[in-house]
């Protein structure tokens, strides 16, 4: 088969637009561990599990509903924690799903690029100092936000999240 992730082909998962890896590395517990991050065999651990265990801000970021979207399990597994980019002349590998993944970069379909950009802007604004958007990606996301303006579903989604989570996303107005 073309993809080894066949069991994920028909699954839908809630996944991060801004990968946990992208903001997780800004946490000391992710990089270095913490005295409270000891497994049941007495071995120290770090990374996502440690940050999740001991850092409340990390848990807020990881569970922020504005950053969670339904995703095809197979495509999400292949996307991994790759950065978004434009991939010129790429072959379509996922049938009708316009998502390209090449050389550790991912290019979403045009109709959601602005949505992705605004999620990045929101996360960067809501959690400052975490290095969520590079200078290069900021320019790309600004272009995507302009090319794919806010639509009715994006507004409705933000309204629903605000009602549950209690905070406003100023990038979807």
Per-range role (PLM):
Residues 1-8:
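Short, small-residue-biased leader/transition segments that mark boundaries at the very start
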């Amino acid at each position: 088969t073309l993809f080894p992730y066949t069991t994920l082909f028909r699954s839908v998962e809630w996944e991060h637009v801004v990968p946990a890896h992208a903001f997780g590395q800004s946490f000391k517990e992710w990089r270095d561990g913490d005295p409270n991050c000891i497994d049941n065999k007495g071995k120290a651990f770090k990374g996502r599990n440690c940050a999740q265990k001991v850092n409340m801000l990390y848990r807020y970021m990881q569970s922020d509903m504005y950053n969670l979207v339904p995703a095809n399990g197979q495509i999400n597994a292949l996307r991994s924690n790759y950065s978004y980019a434009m991939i010129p002349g790429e072959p379509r590998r996922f049938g009708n799903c316009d998502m390209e993944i090449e050389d550790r970069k991912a290019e979403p379909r045009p109709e959601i690029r602005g949505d992705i950009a605004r999620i990045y802007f929101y996360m960067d604004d809501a959690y400052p100092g975490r290095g969520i958007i590079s200078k290069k990606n900021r320019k790309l996301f600004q272009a995507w936000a302009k090319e794919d303006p806010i639509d009715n579903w994006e507004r409705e989604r933000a309204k629903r999240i605000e009602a549950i989570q209690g905070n406003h996303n100023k990038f979807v107005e």
